Amino acid sequence: MTLHLQAAGLACERDWRLLFEQLDFELGAGDMLQISGPNGSGKTSLLRLLAGLMQPTAGQILLGGKPLAEQRHALASILLWIGHAAGIKDLLTAEENLTWLCALHQPASREAIWAALEAVGLRGFEDVPCHTLSAGQQRRVALARLHLACPPLWILDEPFTALDKQGVAQLEAHLAAHCEQGGTVVLTTHHTLERKPSGYRELNLGQWAA
């Protein structure tokens, strides 16, 4: 399907507090949307809404012109979600984690998994239990999924967390390349992006912050 994600009159309330309202935007192939704003402004909540993990207080999200809530299967087939936490199992190795994560959507070969780990600078760590890795290395294990056979829509919550300078530069380049190849990225980050695709834009939720 051709990716077309639309937010119409979107509002979100958490703990009796309005985070944002009347949000309208559209996303398609090649777009990158950076969601910014102070802590507590609803950045993660907006990501979760777009990923179908929450329901809006008002308004709606459309996928291909149809309500997102009616298209769970279609969304799952095009979405890669990586939350703020690495989301990996400490007792599994880096390879085992990626094998398990990929099996939930599209299984990947051992060769592909090793290549993905090499792409994020973890060559030689394939058989290392993740509880022995640093926070940055654990984050890179999670981000290695972006180098496997991936769906077009990436929704990423603070993907640069715990990465060193080289890791940040590599991830920036990979996200931009994904968009330039027709993919779509929605992300939150406090990091100032140095490399932005032509379809980049920013949505600041700060105007609703108390």
Curated annotation (Swiss-Prot):
It is found in: Cell inner membrane. The keyword Repressor does not apply. It comes from the Bacteria. One of its GO terms (cellular component) is plasma membrane. GO terms for molecular function: ABC-type heme transporter activity; ATP binding; ATP hydrolysis activity. Belongs to the ABC transporter superfamily. CcmA exporter (TC 3.A.1.107) family. The complex is composed of two ATP-binding proteins (CcmA) and two transmembrane proteins (CcmB). Its EC number is 7.6.2.5. Residues 3-205 form the ABC transporter domain. It catalyses: heme b(in) + ATP + H2O = heme b(out) + ADP + phosphate + H(+). GO terms for biological process: cytochrome complex assembly. This is Cytochrome c biogenesis ATP-binding export protein CcmA. It is a peripheral membrane protein. ATP binds at G37, P38, N39, G40, S41, G42, K43, T44. The gene is ccmA. Part of the ABC transporter complex CcmAB involved in the biogenesis of c-type cytochromes; once thought to export heme, this seems not to be the case, but its exact role is uncertain. Responsible for energy coupling to the transport system. InterPro entries: AAA+_ATPase, ABC_transporter-like_ATP-bd, ABC_transptr_haem_export_CcmA, P-loop_NTPase. Keywords: ATP-binding, Cell inner membrane, Cell membrane, Cytochrome c-type biogenesis, Membrane, Nucleotide-binding, Translocase, Transport.
